[in-house]
Amino acid sequence: MATFVIEGGHKLHGSITPQGAKNEALQVLCAVLLTKETVVINNLPDILDVNNLIDLIASMGVTVEKLAKGKYAFTARNLDTAYLRSADFLKKCNKLRGSVMFIGPLLARLGEVTYAKPGGDKIGRRRLDTHFQGMVNLGASFEYDHDLLAYRFEGKHLKGSYMLLDEASVTGTANIIMASVLAEGTTTIYNAACEPYLQQLCKLLNAMGAKISGVGSNLLTIEGVKELHGAQHTLLPDMIEVGSFIGMAAITGSELRIRNVGYRDLGIIPDAFRRLGIRIDVDGDDIIIPAQEHYQIESFLDGSILTVADAPWPGLTPDLLSVLLVVATQAKGTVLIHQKMFESRLFFVDKLIDMGAQIILCDPHRAVVVGHDHQRQLKPNNMTSPDIRAGIAMLIAAMSAEGTSKIDHIDQIDRGYEDIEHRLNAIGAKIRREE
């Protein structure tokens, strides 16, 4: 396992550009399975989760051509149905959570799919009920094969349906949309997730000939079509990387320009950092974080302690709560971080406490952070990354701590952040990878 060795306490400077959005990439890559024609995707990030999904798609019989850095052409003319039933396919699906979104496209295209329970981050339970119930609503059936440890879906003639989702699941909504675009009749999805990633998926599908209306709202209407054709698509900048860079600049007291952030699609993210006292200036589609030696957490109007909580879009993405928590350790004031959507994402805070942070872990979902106001710096520490977002939060903490820290299991960080050490070193960080 590779390790990051971080020499903390260095100021950042200059500018950095975010990669293409990881979560969007996983969705649109699955969508290429819906047509026999060529789909070209631009701005794909060079990260483990995306590269592994591309490799798996190629193994399924899809012709994959790399046209330039971040630009790929996919042609799913002849899918290898034998491979889709193989142990190798099931094993790879099990290791890659994004592959859950194969269910909708393959069911729509082939009328059947065998699928292993997916892996991914160990951040608590992430139910598949929304995905499965959506397929059932469209007329599919499924059963669990105890010998294969996999689910078998059948749905030769999917038909449109009205459905009210029990949760606004992002990947669940994506799966149902992709199954619905080739179904007979009209599908209505109420309480649909409406993240920018979903909006981008719908834009791609519409460019391929789908008929999806209500994009950007939680009420989607999909008129089924006979077939889809090729298209071109460009990914949004990764909002999680943008938030991570804001956090790095703030906690190190650095001035940093983050270029081409897709500001309109950041939603509430900039305001969440502003509530921690961080100044964020907007210059066109760039944001500038001025150097701040001190930043003060706001309180509610009645004087009570600020609560920062995740919520379905347009609420705050859960993927940035770990970053906000670390940034708050050096703010002036107190904040309650409430992780509502996952129950294990705050367990990394014990490592921050070892570094000198004042954090009270109330339960698996809530932590109170009492900021040091930079009066006491975090101490270096040796840590292990349990998941992508905790890993980047640990890296941010290590960058602010005077001295040398180590983070093991950094393949978790590589899953979501492209060439992160070289990009950060280019703006003043001191990070070394040891194999």
PLM region spans:
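Short, structured segments at the rim of ligand-binding sites
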Residues: M1-E435
